Curated annotation (Swiss-Prot):
UniProt-listed Pfam families: YL1 (PF05764), YL1_C (PF08265)
Main location: nucleus
Glycyl lysine isopeptide (Lys-Gly) (interchain with G-Cter in SUMO2) crosslink site(s): 115
Region span, Disordered: 1-164, 233-258, 335-357
Molecular function per GO: DNA binding; histone binding; histone chaperone activity
Keyword set, alphabetical order: Chromatin regulator, DNA-binding, Isopeptide bond, Nucleus, Phosphoprotein, Transcription, Transcription regulation, Ubl conjugation
Name of this chain's protein: Vacuolar protein sorting-associated protein 72 homolog
Family named by the database record: Belongs to the VPS72/YL1 family.
Function: Deposition-and-exchange histone chaperone specific for H2AZ1, specifically chaperones H2AZ1 and deposits it into nucleosomes. As component of the SRCAP complex, mediates the ATP-dependent exchange of histone H2AZ1/H2B dimers for nucleosomal H2A/H2B, leading to transcriptional regulation of selected genes by chromatin remodeling.
Gene Ontology BP annotations: positive regulation of double-strand break repair via homologous recombination; regulation of cell cycle; somatic stem cell population maintenance; transcription initiation-coupled chromatin remodeling
Ranges of Acidic residues composition bias in the record: 40-75
Length: 364
């Protein structure tokens, strides 16, 4: 439940409403437009024979669709007189012009003088404004405005006219001397600061730790040297042209600049950094170059029976003949005799490769 509905009504409620309604002036727009809306006596032009309360229905609505005449030649019946329609009513607009109030000449002159003394916020143009300002507040504001005006007038009288006296030659010289001293002090301070800056030598900052430098340049292109040409003196041929004849004469044609190529260099500050980025693995074992015992040449093959390297077919035949003589003189090994004729089986040797399992025979 709202507070307005539950509280008791005021005793003075609605006292000013009647005064506002009486003070409301009529707008001239509705008195002149469309001939005015005021009621005039003897205006019977828009009064009909029948009352406006009765609802009149057109004759066309009384006829049913089935009862319409089939021919159009019949005379149309006169329609009944319709009700007169008047213009719609609009809400009157409030007038913006101030209401003229008849006041005596003496009181209006006095009010105009008091109005000129007040500030713009408190000036009343005589219209019926709806400002709700208490009389005591308006009086205090007026007194404050008068005090401010009086204080401003006293300050103007105290200051008087403002005029500057031209300085004499002695006063100008004294001011110039003071300015010169200030300039000398400023110059000395500036020179001292410049000297301090020169003393502080800018040292190149060195970066601690390893450094990798990347440098890319262009260099002239150097081709690979070709086969050296030998001068051969053959009778009946023309002599070789001289060097002066081979060189082109100046101005005979455009000289092409030498070709250039780019080269990039990466420099490491120490070896540890280089090894960190480019680690070197263990060097591969270089295989031992075996020599043929017959021809003393690099061996290309190996005998599967005697495990002796050889280079040529003749060396292979010599190795086999020596092997047969060895078997004839010393006989086969125990394992070979048990297995019968044929190539001897390999001897098992612990910790040896597949080549070490073969039977080795040294030929002297």
């Amino acid at each position: 439940m709202s507070l307005a509905g539950g509280r008791a009504p005021r005793k003075t409620a609605g006292n000013r409403l009647s005064g506002l309604l009486e003070a409301e002036e009529e707008d001239e727009f509705y008195q002149t437009t469309y001939g005015g809306f005021t009621e005039e006596s003897g205006d019977d032009e828009y009064q009909g024979d029948q009352s406006d309360t009765e609802d009149e229905v057109d004759s066309d609505f009384d006829i049913d669709e089935g009862d319409e005449p089939s021919s159009d030649g019949e005379a149309e019946e006169p329609r009944r007189k319709r009700r007169v329609v008047t213009k719609a009513y609009k809400e009157p607009l409030k007038s913006l012009r101030p209401r003229k109030v008849s006041t005596p000449a003496g009181s209006s002159q006095k009010a105009r003088e008091e109005k000129a003394l007040l500030p713009l916020e408190l000036q009343d143009d005589g219209s019926d404004s709806r400002k709700s300002m208490r009389q005591s507040t308006a009086e205090h504001t007026r007194q404050t405005f008068l005090r401010v005006q009086e204080r401003q007038g006293q300050s103007r009288r105290r200051k008087g006219p403002h005029c500057e006296r031209p300085l004499t030659q002695e006063e100008l010289l004294r001011e110039a001397k003071i300015t010169e001293e200030l300039n000398l002090r400023s110059l000395e301070t500036y020179e001292r600061l410049e000297a301090d800056k020169k003393k502080q030598v800018h040292k190149k900052r060195k970066c601690p730790g390893p450094i990798i430098t990347y440098h890319s340049v262009t260099v002239p292109l150097v081709g690979e040297p070709g086969p050296k040409e030998e001068n051969v003196d053959i009778e009946g041929l023309d002599p070789a042209p001289s060097a002066s004849a081979l060189t082109p004469h100046a101005g005979t044609g455009p000289v092409n600049p030498p070709a250039r190529c780019s080269r990039t260099f990466i420099t490491f500050s120490d070896d540890a950094t280089f090894e960190e980025w480019f680690p070197q693995g263990r060097p591969p074992k270089v295989p031992v170059r075996e020599v043929c015992p017959v021809t003393h040449r690099p061996a290309l093959y190996r005998d599967p029976v005697t495990d002796i390297p050889y280079a040529t077919a003749r060396a292979f035949k010599i190795i086999r003949e020596a092997y047969k003589k060895y078997i004839t003189a010393h006989g086969l090994p125990p394992t070979a005799s048990a297995l019968g004729p044929g190539p001897p089986p390999p001897e098992p040797l612990p910790g040896s490769g597949p080549r070490a399992l073969r039977q080795k025979i040294v030929i002297k």
